[in-house]
C-alpha cells in the first residue's frame, strides 16, 4: 500500500498518526482493490471539537463512504483515540493540487467521415430492454448501479469515476448497465457522441483498418467520442497489437477528459496476458464488482419482469424459480420466459408441478457443482488476497494459510485427486496438498474460530 499524502495542521501530529493507522486497518480489512477505489485518496484535514475532518476527492466518493463506511471509520478512530466523537467527510480542492483539463478539438460526426459514427447507428447497437428503469438493484450490484448512474448523469462533463471498470460473472448485469448508460445519454444529452462495442468487435475493426490502410480513420473514430464503452475487455488478453491500440486510445480519451466504461469477467489485477501498463490504467478510476445474485435480488428481478409482462404467476412458482435458478440473471429470465411461453402455447395453467416438469433439464444443470476455481475465488475474496496468490509460492502467513484452507476445501468438496488439486494451485505436487490438508486438520482440532470459518465457507460454496 502506498502511503497517503498527509496534510499537517496546527492540531498537531496526533490525529495525523491516528489516520495513518486507520488507513492501514482499512487496507488490511477490505483489501487492495476496495481500498484503492475508496480510501487511498482520502486525506486528513483537521480536527475540531473532537470531530475529525477528512477530505474525499469527489462528491461521489464522499457520499459512498458516508453511506457505507462512516461508522467503521469512526470506530477505528475511537480505537486509537477515544476522545474522537464524530467524523465529517468533505470535498474541497486541496492546496498544491491543480487540475488541468485539455479539451479535444470539437468534431461533428460529419467531420469524421464514417457512416458508422452517426448517432442513429451508434444507438442502434443498444438493446431497448436494458435501461436503468428496469434494472433491479440489490446488495450484489448497488455499487455498480450507482457508479453507472453517475456516469450517465454527468451532463456532458467527465464523471467522478473515470474509467469505470465493471467486473463479475456472466449474466449478472454488466452489459445491462452499459446499455443503460447509452440510453440515458441518448434521451437526455443526444448531442454527446457515444460508442458501445465488444472488445472482440474493437479488435476486428482494428484488424480491418490495418488491412485496408484506414488506421487514421479508425483512430479518429474512437478518439473523438465523449463516451467509449468496451464490453468484455478480457478478449484482448494475448492480442498484442490490439492491446497497443487500446492503450493509446485509452490515454487519449482520459487525457482529454472523455469518459470510459469497461467491463470484464475479472478484476484488473487478475487479468492474464495483458500488459502491466494497461492493468494499471484499468484500475485508475472506480473498480466495481457485480456479485452473484442473492435470493432476494432474484425475487425482485422476477417480480419486476412479471410486472413488465403483465402476467400472473403463483407465488410458490416465483419462490421456486428464485430458489433454484441461481447461476445468473440471464438464465433466470430465460426460465421465466419458458414457463410463460409453455402456458401460452398449451393453454395450461402455470402451477408449481408444471413448472418443475417444464424446467426439468435446466434444473438438473443448475444443481450446484463446486469446482476448485470456485473455492479459490471464494477463499481469496474472504481473506482479501489476490486470486493469483492461490497459485503462487509466497510463504507469508496471510497468503499461505488461505491457500492451505482452499486446498483443504478442494479435497472436501470436489472429487479431484490430490495431484489434480495441486495442478490448480500453481502445479504443486500432491505431497504439498497433503501437507496443507493435514495442517488445516490439526488446526481444526483446537481452533474453534477457524472451524466456524471453514463451516461458513462450506455453506456459502454449497448454496
UniProtKB/Swiss-Prot annotation:
PROSITE patterns listed in its UniProt record: DNAA
Disulfide bonds: none
SUPFAM superfamilies, per the entry: P-loop containing nucleoside triphosphate hydrolases, TrpR-like
Coiled coil ranges: none
Localization terms from the record: Cytoplasm
Gene3D superfamilies recorded: 1.10.1750.10, 1.10.8.60, 3.30.300.180, P-loop containing nucleotide triphosphate hydrolases
Molecular function terms, GO-annotated: ATP binding; ATP hydrolysis activity; DNA replication origin binding; lipid binding
Major localization listed first in the record, in broad terms: cytoplasm
One Pfam family per UniProt: Bac_DnaA
Alphabetized CDD domains for the sequence: AAA, Bac_DnaA_C
Protein keywords: ATP-binding, Cytoplasm, DNA replication, DNA-binding, Lipid-binding, Nucleotide-binding
Chain residues that bind ATP: 171, 173-175
GO BP: DNA replication initiation; regulation of DNA replication
Span list, region Domain II: 83-124
Similarity annotation: Belongs to the DnaA family.
Domain notes: Domain I is involved in oligomerization and binding regulators, domain II is flexibile and of varying length in different bacteria, domain III forms the AAA+ region, while domain IV binds dsDNA.
Protein purpose: Plays an essential role in the initiation and regulation of chromosomal replication. ATP-DnaA binds to the origin of replication (oriC) to initiate formation of the DNA replication initiation complex once per cell cycle. Binds the DnaA box (a 9 base pair repeat at the origin) and separates the double-stranded (ds)DNA. Forms a right-handed helical filament on oriC DNA; dsDNA binds to the exterior of the filament while single-stranded (ss)DNA is stabiized in the filament's interior.
HAMAP family in the record: DnaA_bact (MF_00377)
Subunit organization: Oligomerizes as a right-handed, spiral filament on DNA at oriC.
Protein name, entry field: Chromosomal replication initiator protein DnaA
Species for this entry: Rickettsia massiliae (strain Mtu5)
Gene name tied to this protein: dnaA
